[in-house]
């Protein structure tokens, strides 16, 4: 099924004349500069920041093909929540124990979760991305699929540059415009990033204290419940109506008591209180319906908080899986 989806993607991906797209992009860019001026951004910042902005066709290809759409859950988890990554997290915790202990105490976010996010987002800072973020955001703003979202992100980024909180020369990251050790979008930088080392710059790539504290602040402010569970992998012993099953990350629905899930034939949850509430998530049903053995998870409130970080069912399960692996090792 996955191979079929990839083939469909390759066959249906639109092919345009690159030169004609560049002409249209440059027309759009001129209009965007006017919009940026109306947002109160200085002409100097607009010109300096956008002078090298260009249309990146590769960004559109990345946008149309994302692992969340084509990898099944078990493959997704196995590639990311690895033993080698867990051991690397353990070594980094030993090296930076004072920082992680301090941040956990201050923000009430477990060090294991922060290490898991760091490991999955950028392999602990090794893969922060090499794309020109301004060009990436400009390309995605010009593109029709999510133009409004990315245009807002680009405006926010220009404002941060204008306020001298971000150095434009450091802005290299992911194809989607995310930046630094924990891959913050501009809106996340604006809302949650912290100058933790007090040098009057937010340095999410160069400064580990800034990066870790900013990630903890983000998770804390979106409502993370300290030392509470994220999910529990379960088995289904009989069919369950699809109305009870979450296959979309947009909003987790149908929280029910553990006692009800037991009556529905879900096993391996004896250690959880019958009064606790959880929702049933089966990520693969959305894409790979013929997979009758799709992994199933009962998820709790904290799982939804991870989805606010990255709205992907598989990402949420994978982060919590790696966090549990790290916790069991240290």
Give the role of each language-model region.
Residues 4-13:
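Sec-dependent N-terminal signal peptides
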Residues 17-19:
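Boundary at the C-terminal end of the N-terminal hydrophobic targeting segment
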Residues 22-95, 101-104:
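An acidic, Gly/Ser/Thr/Pro-rich helix-cap/linker signature
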Residues 55-62, 122-131, 143-147, 164-169, ...:
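Secretory-pathway/luminal and periplasmic proteins that interact with or process carbohydrate-rich
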Residues 132-141, 154, 179-194, 215:
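Substrate-binding/active-site groove segments that recognize
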Residues 196-204:
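Acidic, glycine-anchored loop motifs typical of Ca2+
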Residues 234-330:
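C-terminal soluble interaction/assembly domains
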């Amino acid at each position: 099924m996955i191979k079929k989806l990839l083939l469909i993607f390759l066959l249906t991906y639109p092919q345009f004349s690159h030169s004609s797209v560049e002409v249209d992009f440059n027309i759009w860019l001129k209009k965007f500069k006017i919009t940026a001026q109306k947002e109160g951004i200085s002409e100097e910042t607009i010109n300096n920041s956008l002078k090298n902005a260009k249309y990146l066709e590769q960004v559109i290809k990345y946008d149309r093909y994302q692992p969340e759409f084509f990898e099944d859950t078990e493959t997704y988890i196995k590639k990311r929540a690895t033993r080698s990554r867990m051991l690397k997290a353990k070594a980094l915790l030993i090296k930076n124990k004072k920082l992680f202990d301090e941040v956990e105490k201050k923000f009430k976010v477990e060090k294991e979760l922060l290490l898991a996010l760091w490991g999955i987002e950028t392999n602990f800072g090794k893969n922060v991305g090499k794309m020109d973020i301004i060009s990436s955001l400009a390309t995605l703003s010009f593109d029709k699929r999510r133009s409004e979202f990315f245009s807002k992100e680009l405006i926010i980024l220009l404002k941060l540059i204008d306020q001298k909180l971000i150095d434009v020369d450091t802005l290299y990251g992911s194809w989607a415009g995310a930046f630094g050790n924990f891959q913050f979008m501009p809106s996340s930088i604006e809302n949650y990033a912290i100058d933790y080392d007090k040098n009057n710059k937010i340095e999410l790539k160069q400064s580990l204290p800034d990066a870790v504290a900013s990630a903890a602040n983000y998770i804390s402010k979106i409502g993370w419940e300290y030392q509470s569970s994220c999910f529990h992998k379960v088995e289904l012993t009989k069919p369950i109506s699809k109305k009870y099953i979450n296959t979309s990350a947009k909003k987790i629905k149908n929280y029910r008591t553990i006692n009800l899930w037991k009556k529905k034939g879900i096993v391996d949850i004896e250690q959880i209180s019958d009064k606790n509430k959880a929702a049933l998530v089966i990520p693969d049903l959305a894409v790979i319906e013929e997979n009758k053995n799709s992994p199933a998870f009962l998820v709790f409130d904290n799982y939804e908080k991870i989805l606010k970080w990255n709205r992907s069912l598989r990402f949420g399960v994978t982060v919590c899986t790696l966090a549990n692996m790290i916790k069991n090792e240290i």
